[in-house]
């Protein structure tokens, strides 16, 4: 009986646990299916290697640790017990698959799966390749280039409203462009998808509060990637409990916003369908993305439930807000900081918009302006879209990566998690010399032909999972640059520097510094 006293039990437990950890270390480092892939042994042993740089004490810094690891170990590295990271833009297309080569999303990264909230039933969070394909088909052509052109007046209306709001503030102090663009993007995505506008541009702060809310919401990601079960549990708690944690409560507030908008649009779609108001010949202005989904012949009825469609509503708002506003902020900083570049873009715009009061050209017309297009490409590159790695699983095939530098091959077995990061692709010096400089000319050769630089842009992803809203995003970029650059005289406020548009953390999306931001003083109309 004496052997069963507490100190002995504690010691026996500790020794047993130590043997377990030692055995686990030996297995994962030397005998695991990924043991042939180079990388730090500690990363192969535990996911908490990532957490040290991702969550605590260095929040959102693992992306830059990846840069160091690739320099030390080469283009393919093992960064977790069952995860591989590749830094090779030429292998990107193969990694992210096609309709024939299936790619599932990995639950290692998409911690929201199975939560019952935070969009876990959305198309974006859907892990299975075939299930995602079904849900994406339910959107129909709502984000196609033709549909975006059809609904372009909705976008133009908000772009011109932003221009009006900026001119109204002429001589009244500095304006934060990220807030202004965020308010416009929020109004556009809600009007475009739900035919209900958030009204951010009607507020005195141009929707700054909503900007801050959504920026705070992504702060949960490093914590949730480290402790997914804890994060899911917290988000299921009552709202009065969530209020204790600002990080979690802001996520809850964003969910409430998305739920209200998508629920209203879904109810309207149901009424219209019941009353026979919605047909294929309806005026485009009366349609919403929820109308398209509710009317879809592809989606089974259980895919049209309230929670399911609200989940897609949430992800549409989130996806249509941050990346567009961040890209516009990057573009306008560089245009305002570089007068010669600004003058060259304005010269092109003037061929379609001769005076500040001229009608705003169409997106189709603006797409024909080569230098403006190069500026937009460079803006998407340096804004990076989703800066963090997009992880996938190949469920039916092994991937073979050939390292051309030493003529070696590495097999990524089916079922293992792998990914690349847009930040590393976009800062690859072999593709983009001086990668941190804003150089639109890199997309055109001296003989006036496109270069390969555009081919490797991955701000919107690649493959079957690439961003559905790419056409809408480009429409916003073209129209906003033309509307503001062609009519508003503004200057960077003192103290605004390139640091204000440089990524300092990765919380799934790239994060700009906690500075006053890119601020401008509006002088008036040109």
UniProtKB/Swiss-Prot annotation:
This is Cytochrome P450 monooxygenase ucsK. The chain crosses the membrane at residues 7-27. Its main location: membrane. It is a single-pass membrane protein. Pfam families: p450 (PF00067). One of its GO terms (molecular function) is iron ion binding. InterPro entries: Cyt_P450, Cyt_P450_E_grp-I, Cyt_P450_sf, Cytochrome_P450_monoxygenase. The gene is ucsK. Keywords: Glycoprotein, Heme, Iron, Membrane, Metal-binding, Monooxygenase, Oxidoreductase, Transmembrane, Transmembrane helix. Disruption phenotype: Leads to the accumulation of intermediate diastereomers that are methylated at C6 of the pyrrolizidinone. Heme binds at residue 467. Pathway: Mycotoxin biosynthesis. The keyword Chloroplast does not apply. SUPFAM superfamilies: Cytochrome P450. Its cofactor is heme. Its EC number is 1.-.-.-. Cytochrome P450 monooxygenase; part of the gene cluster that mediates the biosynthesis of UCS1025A, a member of the pyrrolizidinone family that acts as a strong telomerase inhibitor and displays potent antibacterial and antitumor properties. These compounds share a hemiaminal-containing pyrrolizidinone core fused with a gamma-lactone, giving a furopyrrolizidine that is connected to a decalin fragment. The polyketide synthase module (PKS) of the PKS-NRPS ucsA is responsible for the synthesis of the polyketide backbone via the condensation of an acetyl-CoA starter unit with 6 malonyl-CoA units. It is found in: Membrane.
